[in-house]
Amino acid sequence: MIVFTALTRDINPPSNVERIDPKTLHLSGEFAEQNLGTTVGADGGVTVRVIATQFMFVPRCIAVPHGRRVTLRFATPDVIHGLLITGTNVNTMVVPGFVAQVHTEFTRTGDLLMPCHEYCGLGHSEMWATVQVVPESEFKPGQDGRVSCAQR
């Protein structure tokens, strides 16, 4: 009945609905391993790409600037995950086959916890990542436009 209602009433996952093949998302395109993490575009826009997979976020640490709009994009190849970033308004579900997208601006510096809040199996309690919010003056992308926690 739920599936019938979803199909006939055009019910979709929350957030900007963008479809992606969960079986191949890691092979090419924006969610390939070399494209994960924080990037700064030619226009100065900051985009973070993260894969939520049992039982970890990849990458485990992301660096973002304080006081600038950030676009966070999430995908998963396996099961439904949920995440939030403590002390912010970021709270979303990550559903296989869809890209979850959230826009936010981080208003304080420091390390924030990003746990999975949707039970995803036995290792669920160990599924978390760190968001490092750094002052704008310390947020320096490399020549490739990428910023990582390791650079700090």
Set out the residue ranges of the language-model regions:
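A structural detector for beta-sheet-dominated domains
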Residues: 51-53, 65, 107, 134
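Extracellular Ig-like/FN3 beta-sandwich strand-entry sites
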Residues: 67-69, 109-111
